[in-house]
Regions:
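Walker A/P-loop
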Residues: 79
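Conserved GTP-binding G-domain of TRAFAC-class P-loop NTPases and closely related GTPase folds
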Residues: 67, 71, 173-222
Length: 354
């Protein structure tokens, strides 16, 4: 169904649940409670997930251990989530928490030491496989923000293991403030660099389940969405677009209505939400430019989108991947036909909405 606030906000956001049938612009909108999204988790089950995964029985025929990969930028709540999950005992076996920081501390005496990451992750991979083969569920704790970093370990996981991903999410400013409060801080610049490299995890990588965890965080989801839209209500300042960013997103979403499933329509309406954060009048060489550039906006937009609504693993992946036909054809060409068709629909609407 279309957002009932569409006449006022003109966005046309497609809603899948009645409690979300609002957007902005109505004095007294239909809304759920002022949301405190504390210890909240959600996940989606898109089409043909099973066709990309295989789960078998463990060697003893009784229990299938889990490989649970945490994904997130610094300050997003990975450590908190790891501690929570590590307290469990499954089928009489403890859950093993394997952390890249802990391994750095063990071999170098300093968890912040970035020396020889290859050695660190080689040890991490070996310990992970050994624990899984012993029947333990493993919490794999590192940033894991790129497909390459995830693939290196996913390709080694035994077939009998269930592969799960938990995206630990918080708004960017919250991650920065949490980092500042730590004794061992990475700094805002490092967080920014990681954010711009972020590639949303998805089922084509081999995951059986992807969960988004928003833990210990209080924020109002509707206001968060309004703020995202307000931020992109600015000029593109770029000859490739005649419409402002918000208007471009609106046109993209409208073009998809009736032409694509609702979740792709939704992605069209917000696919460029990362542009407000990334807008710069410097080119890729750092030189002053007369036009605006939006390097890595798809990465930032994907991260921002996790706070919008309850089926964001797919929404985030679509935003993260919508530029792939331009900037990452190798990945685009590797996608299953169904997933590629989703990107094609979004990419076509994006190009036509100027």
């Amino acid at each position: 169904m279309i957002c009932r606030d569409c006449p006022s906000c003109a966005m046309g956001w497609v809603k899948n649940r009645p409690e979300e049938a609002w957007c902005i612009g109505v004095p007294e909108p239909f809304h759920i409670d002022d949301i405190d999204m504390t210890c909240t988790e959600y996940f989606d089950t898109p089409y043909e997930v099973a066709s990309h995964t295989t789960i078998q029985f463990s060697p003893d025929g009784n229990y299938t251990p889990k490989f649970i990969m945490l994904v997130g930028i610094p300050g997003s709540g990975k450590s908190t989530k790891a501690k929570e999950l590590s307290k469990q005992h499954i089928a009489g076996k403890s859950v093993v928490h394997i952390s890249s920081d802990a391994i750095r501390g063990r071999i170098y005496g300093d968890e912040s030491c970035q020396r020889d990451p290859g050695k660190v992750f080689s040890i991490m991979h070996e310990e992970t496989i050994n624990a899984l083969n012993s029947g333990h569920t493993v919490i794999y704790d590192a940033t894991n923000i790129t497909r390459k970093s995830r693939k290196e370990i996913l390709n080694k996981i035994p077939n009998f293991v269930s592969k799960e991903c938990v995206v630990c999410w918080a708004p960017i400013e919250v991650c920065i403030e949490r980092d500042k409060a730590r004794v061992r801080t990475v700094g805002e610049n490092v967080i920014d660099k990681m954010l711009r490299r972020f590639e949303a995890p998805y089922y084509d990588e081999g995951f059986n389940k992807i969960t988004v965890s928003i833990d210990g965080l209080h924020y109002h989801r509707r206001q968060y969405y309004i703020d995202l839209l307000s931020a992109i209500n600015i000029s593109h300042d770029n000859p490739h677009h005649t419409a402002d960013i918000l208007e471009h997103c609106r046109l993209c979403g409208i073009k998809l209505i009736g032409e694509a499933p609702d979740f792709i329509v939704n992605a069209g309406f917000v696919h460029d939400i990362g542009k407000a954060y990334t807008k710069t009048f410097k080119n890729h060489k750092g030189e002053e430019s007369d036009i605006a550039h939006y390097y890595d906006h798809q990465a930032v937009g994907a991260w921002l989108s996790y706070g919008i609504e309850g089926h964001s693993p797919t929404l985030a992946w679509l935003i993260s991947t919508h530029m792939a036909p331009f900037i990452n054809q190798k990945y685009y060409n590797s996608l299953p036909p169904l997933y590629k068709s989703w990107i094609d629909k979004l990419h076509k609407a994006d190009r036509e909405a100027h």
